[in-house]
C-alpha cells in the first residue's frame, strides 16, 4: 500500500490521542474495553474534526490548481463547511459555503449559532438554500461553483463530506496507518473500530487502511443518514476507488463494508431516545461530548452493541470520535436541562 506518494498539507497537530473510556466500559459490565481516538481534537483550526484530516490531501491539489476560493456544501449545521471555512481562512483563500436545509428541526436560532456562526465569523460567504437532505452531488453547489467563475474567481470544488472528491478517502487510510503505529507503541490491538457513516469517505478510507492487516470488516459503520442504501453504495464505491489509488493489492468486496442501520432514526439530524441517552451517559461518565447528528448516534450504536453482547468478551473496541460538538448549541432546547 502506498499512501506516501500523495502530497499532504499539514492542518492537524499530528497523531490524534487514543483515550481509554474506563468508566463507560465499567458501567457497561467491564467485559469489553472501550477506547476513543479523538479526531475531534486533531487541529487548532476551528475545533478540527474528521474533515480536516481529509482536507490535508485535497489542499495540495487546490494549491497546484492555483485556486483562490474553496467551495463546499452541507446542511445548516454542517461540520464540513465549518472546517472548510477554517482551512480557507488559514490559507488566505476565499470560501463559499452552500448550506442546505438538511434537517427537519425548527428552532429560531438554528441558522445563527454553532457551526454556521463560526463559518460566518471566519469570513465565509454563507448561502442558505432550502433544498433537503441528499448525500450526492447537488445542483446548488454546482451553481455556487459557476458563480465564482463568473465573478472571475478560481473555485476549488469540495463536495459534501469531501466524499465524492477523488482524493476524499485518503485521509482515513492514514488514520488506519496511524492506529497501527499507536497499537505497536501501546502493545495492544483493536478488535473493532466503530465509526459514524453518512457521506461515506471516512469509513471507506478506514476500510482500505485496515484491509492492509485483515481488519476491513472489523470497521463497524453506524449509519446516521437514515438512507442506508445510498450510504452503503457510496462507501463501497469510494473504498474501491481509494484502494486503487493506494495500490492496496486486493479488491474491496461487499463483505468488507459493514454498516449497522439500527441507530439512524427517526431521520437524518434528529436524535432518538437512544441517541440522547448515549450523549448524556458519555458526557457524565467520561466528560466526553458528542452531538445529536453524528457522534451521538455512533456512540449509541457502540453502547447498544456492548449491551447486546455483539462484541466478544475481552474485545478492545476503538470509537472514532469524528467531531461535531460545535453543533450542540443549535440543539440547546433539547439539552436545556442537561
From Swiss-Prot:
InterPro entries per record: ACCD_DCysDesulf, ACP_carboxylate_deaminase, ACP_carboxylate_deaminase_bac, TrpB-like_PALP, TrpB-like_PALP_sf
Keywords: Hydrolase, Pyridoxal phosphate
Pfam families linked to this entry: PALP
EC number: 3.5.99.7
MF annotations from Gene Ontology: 1-aminocyclopropane-1-carboxylate deaminase activity; D-cysteine desulfhydrase activity; pyridoxal phosphate binding
Gene3D superfamilies given in the database record: 3.40.50.1100
Active site: 78 (nucleophile)
Catalytic activity: 1-aminocyclopropane-1-carboxylate + H2O = 2-oxobutanoate + NH4(+)
Cofactor: pyridoxal 5'-phosphate
Highest taxon listed in the record's lineage: Bacteria
PTM-bearing positions, type N6-(pyridoxal phosphate)lysine: 51
GO biological process terms, semicolon-separated: 1-aminocyclopropane-1-carboxylate metabolic process; amine catabolic process
Oligomer status and interactors: Homotrimer.
Family annotation (NCBIfam families): ACC_deam
Function, in words: Catalyzes a cyclopropane ring-opening reaction, the irreversible conversion of 1-aminocyclopropane-1-carboxylate (ACC) to ammonia and alpha-ketobutyrate. Allows growth on ACC as a nitrogen source.
Recorded family membership: Belongs to the ACC deaminase/D-cysteine desulfhydrase family.
HAMAP family noted in UniProt: ACC_deaminase
Protein name: 1-aminocyclopropane-1-carboxylate deaminase
Amino acid at each position: 500500500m502506498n499512501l506516501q506518494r500523495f502530497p499532504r498539507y499539514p492542518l492537524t497537530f499530528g497523531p490524534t490521542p487514543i483515550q481509554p473510556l474506563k468508566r463507560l466500559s465499567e458501567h457497561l459490565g467491564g467485559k469489553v474495553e472501550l477506547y476513543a481516538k479523538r479526531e475531534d481534537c486533531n487541529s487548532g483550526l476551528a475545533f478540527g474534526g474528521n474533515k480536516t484530516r481529509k482536507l490535508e490531501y485535497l489542499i495540495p491539489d487546490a494549491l497546484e490548481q492555483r485556486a483562490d476560493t474553496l467551495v463546499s456544501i452541507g446542511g445548516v449545521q454542517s461540520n464540513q463547511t465549518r472546517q472548510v471555512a477554517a482551512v480557507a481562512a488559514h490559507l488566505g483563500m476565499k470560501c463559499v459555503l452552500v448550506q442546505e436545509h438538511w434537517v427537519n428541526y425548527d428552532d429560531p436560532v438554528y441558522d445563527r449559532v454553532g457551526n454556521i456562526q463560526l463559518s460566518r465569523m471566519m469570513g465565509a460567504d454563507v448561502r442558505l438554500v432550502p433544498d433537503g437532505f441528499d448525500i450526492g452531488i447537488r445542483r446548488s453547489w454546482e451553481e455556487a461553483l459557476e458563480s465564482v467563475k463568473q465573478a472571475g474567481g478560481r473555485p476549488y470544488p469540495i463536495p459534501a463530506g469531501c466524499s465524492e472528491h477523488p482524493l476524499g478517502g485518503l485521509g482515513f487510510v492514514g488514520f488506519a496507518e496511524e492506529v497501527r503505529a499507536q497499537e505497536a507503541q501501546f502493545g495492544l490491538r483493536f478488535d473493532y473500530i466503530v465509526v459514524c457513516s453518512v457521506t461515506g469517505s471516512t469509513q471507506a478510507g478506514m476500510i482500505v487502511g485496515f484491509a492492509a492487516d485483515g481488519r476491513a470488516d472489523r470497521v463497524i459503520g453506524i449509519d446516521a443518514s437514515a438512507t442506508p442504501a445510498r450510504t452503503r453504495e457510496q462507501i463501497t464505491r469510494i473504498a474501491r476507488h481509494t484502494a486503487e489509488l493506494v495500490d492496496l493489492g486486493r479488491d474491496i468486496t461487499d463483505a468488507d463494508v459493514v454498516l449497522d442501520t439500527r441507530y439512524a432514526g427517526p431521520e437524518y439530524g434528529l436524535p432518538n431516545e437512544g441517541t440522547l441517552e448515549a450523549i448524556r451517559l458519555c458526557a457524565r461518565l467520561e466528560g466526553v461530548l458528542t452531538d445529536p447528528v453524528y457522534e451521538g448516534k455512533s456512540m449509541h450504536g457502540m453502547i447498544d452493541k456492548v449491551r447486546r453482547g455483539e462484541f466478544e468478551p475481552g474485545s478492545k473496541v476503538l470509537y472514532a470520535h469524528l467531531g461535531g460538538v460545535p453543533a450542540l448549541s443549535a440543539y440547546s432546547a433539547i439539552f436545556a436541562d442537561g
